[in-house]
Amino acid sequence: TPEESIDFKARHPTKAREMFFYYYKELAEHMNRWKLVATERPFCVPLDTEDERIFYSGRIDKVIEDESGQIWLLEHKTSTMFSKTLGFRYDFVQSFSPNSQIEGYMYATLFLQHMEELPNDKEFGGVYVDASLIHKAHFHFKRIPIYYNNLLVAEWLDDVRYWHDAFQRSTKENVFPRSPHSCQSKFGQCPYINLCRAKPSLAEIPDEPPE
């Protein structure tokens, strides 16, 4: 409806149908050369072999085998970050390396291969970010390869364990440091921002509400 077009801007069924046509037109050659291994592949993998309570779960959009026999993940992403010269803005393309989601999916894939839940006789190539531009007047698609690197994945695992330990300490000591860089993001502002502005010292906020 016209109202929905206003509310959702370029994100509406008519635009999705047009995008699907152009997506297939531009990328059919790739799809014909690749073999689909899995779609919407769920996973739940441990992060610490000594503590089974710590795990990482998610769902991989697609797993494919390319023409060289390598295993790749396909992660679909949409964006409104339009560039007249490049199609996608440079900062959008660069946002996937380093990227905790991409690196986490690499870690999960290695574990699934180790458990023989994904083909373990194939080399793991990495992740293709299957990007689609959402724009009123333009169509643009790009597959951004992020190549697997074992040192990158090891660093991701160290980071996750560090933040898990930090959160556990905060929970135990009831001390949670501020994270000002999270106050504003592309999704809007934190719903608790007014609380921080009204009472900067959270330690002074009583546990019980006032009578």
Feature-to-residue mapping (PLM):
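Structured loop/turn residues at beta-strand edges in well-structured enzyme cores
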Residues: 34, 58, 122
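Charge-dense, low-complexity intrinsically disordered segments
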Residues: 3-10, 14, 92, 96, ...
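Residues embedded in well-ordered secondary-structure elements
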Residues: 28, 51-52, 179
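A non-catalytic, helix-rich entry segment at domain boundaries
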Residues: 1-47
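Non-catalytic protein-protein interaction segments used by genome-maintenance enzymes to assemble
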Residues: 38-114
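Metal-dependent nuclease catalytic regions and adjoining charged, substrate-binding loops involved
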Residues: 86, 94-97, 104-211
